[in-house]
């Protein structure tokens, strides 16, 4: 990325490009490879860290994390029998999970929920929903409700 350097929520980067978006625009973000200060040459800026900065620095009404393999936050990994959707999550609730840093270098579900919790201090509507069901984004924005997990700080 040419506009951001470093990794983590305190990465260096100017978010003003997002301020000039037309009203009622849904900005979609994702992580990317970025330059890093020495001794590192590059790193992966997590989309979760980008969302934390956007939520705290911009006039954000919704923060929606689109998940690729589940309807929202589950009480245990989706491949475990009996995994159930948590419809309302607070940081006091513990979840069973695992993170394979060989596959996901940015923190997996644990970074995602930590980021969502931080965002919920600035943004009322913070959700983790099924990215395979794009109509749920529209449903959430239009009605304030959908199937997934709402995060409360």
Regions found by a protein language model. Give the residues of each.
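C-terminal catalytic "cap/lid" subdomain
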Residues: 1-153
């Amino acid at each position: 990325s040419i506009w951001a350097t470093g990794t983590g929520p305190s990465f260096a980067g100017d978010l003003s490009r997002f301020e000039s978006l037309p009203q009622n625009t849904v900005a979609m973000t994702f992580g990317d490879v970025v330059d890093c200060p020495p001794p590192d040459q590059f790193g992966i800026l997590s989309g979760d860290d980008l969302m934390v900065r956007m939520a705290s620095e911009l006039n954000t009404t919704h923060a929606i994390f689109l998940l690729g393999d589940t309807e929202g936050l589950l009480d245990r990994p989706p491949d475990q029998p009996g995994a159930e959707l948590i419809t309302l999550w607070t940081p006091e609730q513990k979840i069973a999970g695992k993170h394979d840093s060989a596959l996901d270098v940015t923190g997996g579900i644990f970074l995602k929920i930590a980021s969502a919790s931080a965002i919920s201090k600035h943004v009322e509507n913070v959700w983790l929903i099924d990215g395979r069901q794009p109509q749920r984004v529209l449903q959430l924005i239009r009605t304030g409700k959908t199937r997934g997990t709402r995060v409360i700080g």
